[in-house]
Amino acid sequence: MKSKSIMAASTVMELALAQASADPLCSTIINLQPIEYQFQQPVLIDSYFPANTDIVLDDGHVVHVTNAPTSLSTVLTDVSTSSTTLTSSASNGNGNPPDGGYLTFTVPANPDDIGNHPVTKTYPPTEPGQPGIVVIQVPTSPPGADGIPTSSVPYVTVTTTGDFPSLTGPVTTTVTPGEPGATGSVIIEVPNTKITSPSASYVTVTTPGSVAPTDAPRTSTIPPSNPTDPGTVIVVVPSSQASSVSSIPFVTVTTTGSTLNPTDDPITSTISPSGSTGSGTVIVEVPPSSSPSGSGASSSPVSVVTRTVTGDDGNGEPSTTTITPTASSGPGTVIVEVPPPTNSPSATSPGSSRPGGPGSSGTGSSASQGPSDSAALSSSTGDAGPSSSVPETSSPSRATTDDAASSTSASAPASSSAASSITQSETPSSAGAETSTPATSPASSSAPSTSDADTSSPVNPTTSSPASSAATSAPGSSTESAPSSSTSSAAANFDPCPDSLYGNPQCCSVDVLGVADVECDSPTESPTDADNFQAICAASGQRARCCVLPVLGQALVCLTPVGVSN
C-alpha cells in the first residue's frame, strides 16, 4: 500500500492569508514564490529472494539484496521533493477575502494513486471570512536521471555470473532506454556461486581375490555417499601375493582429470608395489568440479578407520558403509563388505587327485588358497613297504605350490624329486627315508619315515589340508626339523601394525568398564607374530593394540591388530 502526505508549514499559510487581505484595493491574483514540498512514500518489501538481485524504485533508487537466499521483510521510506505555486483569490474591498475565496495548491501525484487525470480536492473554510483550500493533484511521475519518468520505463533484469576472485560481490549496471517507450535493462553480475565440493578423499582397501598372480591388481571406485564422507578404492590383489589384508599398503593420490566432464565418475588406476615391502599407488582422477583445492595432487588426508568384513549382498560387488565421526577431532569409520575370495585356478596342485601307490596312507587333496595360504598336499610313498604319513605343520612363511607339486607328484617306486634330495641331509631318518620340508615353524615337529618312502609336506599357515587331518603317524616315530631361514626372515620382518595411521604398537590396560584402552606402553620386546604380540602384552596384564600417535590434548585411539583376539 502506498500513500503520500503533504507537509506544508503553518507559517507559509499565515503568510498567504496575510498577503491576501493586506491590500483591500488589490483585486488581482497573488502568485507567491514556489513552495517546495517533501513527499514521503512508504515502500513495503516482504518477499523471499532465492538469489541476489536489485529492486528499482519509482524514483530511480536501487535497493541491493545480497546474502541470498534470504527472506526480507522491511518498510523503506522513499523521500522525494516537489515544488508548487500558491495562488489566492482577490479581496472584496473591506479587508476580508470575499465569500467563496480559496487558496489553490497544485501538487504532483503518483499516477498509480490517482490515475492519469488530475484530481481536485476542496476544503471549505473552517471559520467565516477565512479562505478555503483547493488542492489539485496532477499525475506526474518522478523523473529519472535523464529526465524520463521512471514509472513509465519498463526494466528487464538480467543476472549473469563472473569469475572469482576477480568478482567478489554483486555488481549492478543499469542501462536506461535511449528513447521514451523503450525498455531498460538492469544487469546484475554475481560471482560464480556453484558450490565446489571439498577435497575428494578416498580410502584404499586391499583385499585378496580371484586374480591371477601374473595379472595386475584390479581396482574399483565407490563414490562418496554424501559430500562429507570419503570415497572408497578397493584394490583386489592375487591371493598368492596377499599375506594379509593390510600387509600391502597402497597410497591414494587424487588428481584432476583434464579430459573428464563434471558429471563423469572418478577413474582409478593402480601401480603395483615395486618390491615385497614397498607401497603401491592408487591414482584417482576426479572431475574438475570435485578436484582438491590448490594445485597438484595430494594424498588423502582424511582420518578414517577402515574395517573389512566378509559378506555378500547378492551382487558379488564390494559395498561400503560410512560412519561419521562422533567428535570433530575423531576418526570416521568405513566398513567395507567384500565377497569371500573364490578358489584360484593356480591354487590346486597338479596330480593332487591321483591316488597314491601301494602302501599310501591317503589320497591327494587340494586346498583353496586364501591370504598367506599354500596348497596342502598329502604324502605319497614308494615301494619299500608300509610307511607312515607325517602330519602337516603350519608356518608363517610362504611356500609355493609349484615346488610342492614337484616333490610329491611322483608316486612311482623309483622316482624322487630334487627337493627331496636337497633336504635329505636336514632331517634324520631311521630307514633312509627322503623327506622334503620347504618350511616349518620352530614349534612344529615331523616324524621320520620308517620306510624308504619319499615324503613331501609343504606348509599351510592358516588352512589344514583334509588329507593331513586324516593321516596318522606311526607308533614311535618322531623327528625334529630345524627352523627354516624363511621363517626367521618372516619373524624379523613382522610388522604388528602395518596400517599407516594406526602404526604404533602398544600394550594397553583396560579401563574400569572393560571397554576403553588406557595407560598404553610400548612392548618390552619386538613381536615376531600376532600370537607373540598378544603374549608379550598379556605377560604384563595388558592387551595388544595398534594406536594412533597421540596429539597434544587428544585422546589415544587404538585398534585390535589383525590376528589378535584379546
Swiss-Prot record:
Tell me what this protein is called.
Class II hydrophobin FOXG_02748
Q: What does this protein do?
A: Aerial growth, conidiation, and dispersal of filamentous fungi in the environment rely upon a capability of their secreting small amphipathic proteins called hydrophobins (HPBs) with low sequence identity. Class I can self-assemble into an outermost layer of rodlet bundles on aerial cell surfaces, conferring cellular hydrophobicity that supports fungal growth, development and dispersal; whereas Class II form highly ordered films at water-air interfaces through intermolecular interactions but contribute nothing to the rodlet structure.
Q: Name the Pfam families on file.
A: Hydrophobin_2
What domain of life does the UniProt record list for this protein's source?
Eukaryota
Record's GO cellular component, any one?
extracellular region
Kindly report the protein's main subcellular placement as a broad class.
secreted
Task: Please name the InterPro entries in this protein's record.
Answer: Cerato-ulmin_hydrophobin, Hydrophobin_sf
The record's similarity note reads: Belongs to the cerato-ulmin hydrophobin family.
Record text on subunit structure and interactions: Homodimer. Homodimers further self-assemble to form highly ordered films at water-air interfaces through intermolecular interactions.
What is the source species? Fusarium oxysporum f. sp. lycopersici (strain 4287 / CBS 123668 / FGSC 9935 / NRRL 34936)
Q: Could you tell me where this protein is found in the cell? A: Secreted; Secreted, Cell wall
Signal peptide positions are: 1-22
Q: Which UniProt keywords apply?
A: Cell wall, Disulfide bond, Secreted, Signal, Virulence
- Cystine links in this protein are 497-546, 507-537, 508-520, 547-558
Q: Under what conditions is it induced?
A: Expression occurs in the early stages of infection and is directly regulated by the transcription factor FTF2.
